Amino acid sequence: NDGRIHLEQAMEVFKSGKICYIDKPIGATLGQAIAIYEMAEKYNVPIFSSSALRYSPQNQKLRNGEFGKILGADCYSPHKVEPTHPDFGFYGIHGVETLYTLMGTGCESVNRMSSQDADVVVGRWKDGRIGTFRGIKEGPAIYGGTAYTPKGAIAAGGYEGYKVLL
């Protein structure tokens, strides 16, 4: 979970020439993330970074249109604030990645409201759809969401471990 050590760890993998997966966050700063990708390119090593939530079977079904077009989505995850990492980069990234898994790219406008217990971010996509992310600061560490489709409101997948990456 500590992105500050990922560059050092990844360098050992890159030197071995093995494919590299780095759990979120890829780095504690944008500079570290860029350095990791530059080193992967230098050593010609395939690399990817992701939240395992992207690959939950339910989220993949939603993404692939099994319930119809995603008309909008509301997603949530823990949002533990870690001073060594920017904003949602430590844990909030899980819910943000779930939202993008369901909605795809194209978010063009963002508004945010914060309180002691949560952060809520509302995004508008270029096609007019709206998606939200709730970063839970207090309360249980839960992951999930709701996707709105022509077939109704469908539960998004939560954390199912790392086996879904294989």
Regions found by a protein language model. Give the residues of each.
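C-terminal helix-rich "cap/oligomerization" subdomain common to oxidoreductases
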Residues: 1-4, 12, 42, 126
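Short beta->alpha connector loops
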Residues: 2-4, 26-27, 53-55, 114-116, ...
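A contiguous active-site-proximal alpha/beta segment in oxidoreductase catalytic domains
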Residues: 21, 26-85, 95
